[in-house]
Swiss-Prot record:
The keyword Amino-acid biosynthesis applies. Its EC number is 2.6.1.9. Coiled coil: none annotated. This is Histidinol-phosphate aminotransferase. The lineage of its organism: Bacteria, Pseudomonadati, Pseudomonadota, Betaproteobacteria, Nitrosomonadales. Keywords: Amino-acid biosynthesis, Aminotransferase, Histidine biosynthesis, Pyridoxal phosphate, Transferase. Its cofactor is pyridoxal 5'-phosphate.
């Protein structure tokens, strides 16, 4: 008898599922550790947690949880428009920014088309491309970042582009002039997805301010998330900003209730709490200095990062990762990103960063 598995398209059967950072509860089960002694620095989450205002909004939203959410996210749409000076028809809301990436793929990628992205790009770009039956083209990196000239050279009449700025997992950043010049050279029929998941961790002078470019580049789609600096990773809220025509097509393939009511309420409150985001930025700056100085003290090189994480080089990275797990420290292996000798560590609280560096030093000493 033919198995149902065989009826699935070959591109679906060939997909390697996305591997998220290991949850604390999973490591506790595997290692027999108490969850309270484990620190997770693997998924680029906000170590401050969530804005108290967003938490209060969640509690209030639970009163009406038996009702379906607003399928058009009216209050959240209004909030985003006011905060970023946008128009309602420019927006698409998603169950995290991963949902925005998938909606873009569903709307604009088909078998016979191509998605171009950088060598060390976020794994989801390749995943959503493969799911549509389109071809993925990985352009070799330049200094762990985007080689924009090579990406331009890869463009054909079948191309769509994915760019992350800052890039994950390398943390590299394209300058505003370089990015804008690149967009000006991209043919207007080529969709450019600009993933700005870590924009809130950039100093003001480093931000692209790409929302202001939409009037000139109607082929640009900017993806944002509330999972990082806003601390709503567990609720899954993201949004895309683009031209009305592109937004309309993406909304046609969007599920009607893809952002739940608790997430919508929390997102509005989080977007309005500038003080919490400022605290998150300041903590990240201090934590980045703490970690990079600590890695340098241990004689380890790292990739200068503009996100809330840093990737560092260490011999036998897979073994070091396992040793960290045994000691209750979760970081992220990035061998799947063509970086087999690197690990990525998220910025945590001061004590968490110190614990990671202490444990890492112990591991390195046992190998000398």
């Amino acid at each position: 008898m033919t198995r149902l598995y065989d009826f699935a398209p070959s591109n679906i059967r060939a997909i390697a599922p996305y591997q998220p950072g290991k949850p604390i509860t999973e490591l506790a089960r595997e290692m027999g550790l108490k969850p309270g002694v484990i620190i997770k620095l693997a998924s680029n989450e906000n170590p401050l947690g969530v804005s108290p205002k967003a938490y209060a909004a969640m509690q209030d939203a639970l009163e009406d949880i038996a009702r379906y959410p607003d399928g058009n996210s009216f209050a959240l749409r209004d909030c985003v428009c006011r905060k970023f000076k946008l128009q309602p028809d420019q927006l698409v809301f998603g169950n995290g920014s991963n949902d925005i990436l998938e909606l873009a793929a569903r709307a604009f990628l088909t078998p016979g088309t191509e998605a171009v992205y950088a060598q060390h790009a976020f794994a989801v770009y390749a995943l959503v491309t493969q799911a549509t039956g389109a071809s993925g083209i990985s352009v070799p990196a330049r200094d762990f970042g985007h080689d924009l000239d090579a990406m331009l050279a890869a463009i054909t009449d079948k191309t769509r582009l994915f760019i992350a700025n800052p890039n994950n997992p390398t943390g590299t950043l394209l300058s505003k002039p370089a990015l804008r010049d690149f967009l000006a050279k991209v043919p207007r029929q080529v969709l450019v997805v600009l993933d700005e998941a870590y924009d809130e961790y950039l100093a003001a002078e480093l931000k692209s301010e790409a929302f202001s470019w939409l009037a000139e580049f109607d082929n640009l789609l900017i993806s944002r998330t509330l999972s990082k600096a806003y601390g709503l990773a567990g609720l899954r809220v993201g949004f895309g900003v683009t031209s009305p025509g592109v937004a309309d097509l993406m909304n046609r393939v969007r599920q009607p209730f893809n952002v739940n009511s608790v997430a919508q309420a929390a997102a509005v409150a989080a977007l309005e709490d500038d003080e919490f985001v400022e605290r998150s930025y300041a903590l990240n700056q201090a934590g980045m200095q703490q970690l990079t100085e600590g890695l340098a003290r241990l004689g380890l090189s790292y990739i200068p990062s503009y996100g809330n994480f840093v990737s560092f080089h260490v011999a036998q990275a897979a073994e070091v990762y396992q040793q960290l797990l045994k000691r209750g420290v979760i970081v992220r292996p990035v061998a799947a990103y063509d970086m087999p000798d690197y690990l990525r560590v998220s910025i945590g609280l001061h004590a968490e960063n110190a614990r990671f560096l202490e444990v890492l030093e112990q591991i390195l000493k046992t190998r000398t």
